[in-house]
Amino acid sequence: MTDFKVGDHIVDFENIYQIYAVKTQKDLKGAPVKCFFYRPLEASERDKSVVASVPIDNVAKSGLRHLISKDGVKEFFKLLGKPLDTALLFEPKLTKEALYLNDPIKTVPILKLLFQNKIQTAEKFAKTNSEVMERIVKHLSDEIAFVTKKSFKSIHSQILSTLKKSST
């Protein structure tokens, strides 16, 4: 998982970033450690100075990953379009845990369960579940729009319409 390089776009469970440097720093014991430095891709004027770093040896634990590939986007929509496995149960706690895995493909069943729960409970759909679902859709829309060079709005609509079709 250390195949990142300067210029790469990476993503965590919230934002898309760009690696702008690899530097050697000292850890708490004074030992040299190579680190990636990255910043949000769409930083506001106020956030332009916001940067983060992660030791190369800890990238696997950081939750950062490369953006989904174009083939991954196809697989995502293919899985999203399939009917929900009726054996799956809605577990709100597991939903949040799975989101932190930051894997679009593993997010599909969670998104489908949330959507199904929204349909079944209608106006009783919990506000927190609604917020989580919208956050997932927004994050996936941002990432897929960036990868496919399509608009956020069109990807957002495509995700929601695919969810609706697979739920009927």
Predicted regions and their residues:
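Short solvent-exposed strand/turn elements
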Residues: 27-57
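Generic alpha-helical secondary structure signal
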Residues: 8, 21, 40-42
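Short, well-ordered loop/turn sites that connect or cap secondary structure elements
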Residues: 3-4, 11
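Short, surface-exposed secondary-structure edge patches
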Residues: 1-3, 26-27
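Charge/polar-rich, low-complexity and marginally structured segments
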Residues: 57-168
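Short glycine-/polar-rich loops that comprise or flank the Walker A/P-loop
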Residues: 14-15, 34
